[in-house]
A protein has these predicted regions:
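Short, structured motif recognition centered on aromatic/hydrophobic residues
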Residues: 27-36, 45, 62-66, 162-172, ...
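Acidic, glycine/proline-rich low-complexity segments that act as flexible tails and inter-domain linkers
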Residues: 9-26, 39, 43-54, 78-160, ...
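Substrate/cofactor-recognition hotspot
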Residues: 64, 70-76
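Winged helix-turn-helix DNA-binding recognition segment
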Residues: 57-61
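Short, glycine/charged-rich beta-strand-loop motifs at protein surfaces that mediate ligand recognition
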Residues: 156, 169-175, 188
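Short conserved catalytic/interaction loops centered on acidic-Pro-aromatic/His motifs
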Residues: 46-48, 178-186
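Single conserved hydrophobic/aromatic residue that forms the stacking wall/gate
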Residues: 1-8
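C-terminal structured interaction module
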Residues: 190, 196-197
């Protein structure tokens, strides 16, 4: 019975979900990898990673998609997937370590992180958010700017539009992130990812993250895009 259920789900994904989207194969694979990190699904992650490599997604793109989940899912959830990614790449004959993609240093990560936030969300919005933070929480704002944006969004290997879409997919897959999803729906719109792209992303995620999280993600999209 469980096998029939799994086969039925696979057929649904192949015959109904995949065609109902304009996402290219690379984007779909990267979003699904992020979702499987967030949902802690290593066996399916392994299958998708191998399929992605077979279909021409580069090791750097794959590794960067996993890295992009770290500030949202947390290191406790992502560490084993980084190890698993390295193990699969090694099994496939990929020489490790991969070329470094970091562009910031200890001295520049905060400044460049703030600049990246401003590019995505607007200078006035970010400056106001940082200025209005209570004194006892200003260090959190610095952590957010330096780590989330300075350490990850500034990396090469994936462009800013891809990273922002991966962030939305990770948040949707985690669940309980409605406020952050709304913020990153706006972020996606700001960098040029439109409503249809976000809906296409949720459509591809739905079989893996379930209806409640998918419907919450759609609600966030509707909430923000209705105000545009």
């Amino acid at each position: 019975e469980m096998l029939r259920s799994l086969v039925g789900s696979e057929m649904c994904i192949r015959d109904r979900v995949q065609p109902h989207s304009n996402l290219n194969a690379k984007t779909r694979y990267l979003l699904l990898l992020a979702a499987h990190v967030a949902t802690q699904s290593p066996e399916e992650f392994r299958l998708i990673l191998n399929r992605a490599l077979d279909d021409g997604v580069s090791p750097i793109e794959i590794k960067e998609a996993v890295y992009q989940t770290i500030p949202y899912a947390g290191m406790a959830k992502t560490y084993d997937f980084l190890l698993l990614t390295n193990r699969i790449l090694s099994e496939r004959g990929v020489k490790l370590p991969l070329a470094a993609q970091s562009t910031t240093t200890t001295n520049t990560r905060l400044e460049q992180g703030i600049r990246t936030q401003q590019e995505i969300f607007g200078t006035e919005h970010i400056d106001t958010m940082r200025a209005n933070a209570p004194e006892e929480l200003k260090h959190i704002q610095d952590y957010l700017s330096a780590n989330c944006f300075g350490d990850y969004y500034t990396r090469t290997g994936l462009d800013i539009k891809s990273r922002e879409l991966l962030t939305f997919a990770t948040l949707a897959s985690l669940g309980g992130t409605e406020a952050q999803m709304r913020a990153h729906v706006q972020g996606n719109l700001n960098v040029g990812n439109n409503r249809q792209l976000l809906l296409d992303a949720v459509t591809q995620l739905l079989p893996f993250i379930g209806y409640p999280r998918s419907l919450n993600a759609i609600a966030a999209i509707n909430d923000i895009t209705s105000k545009q």
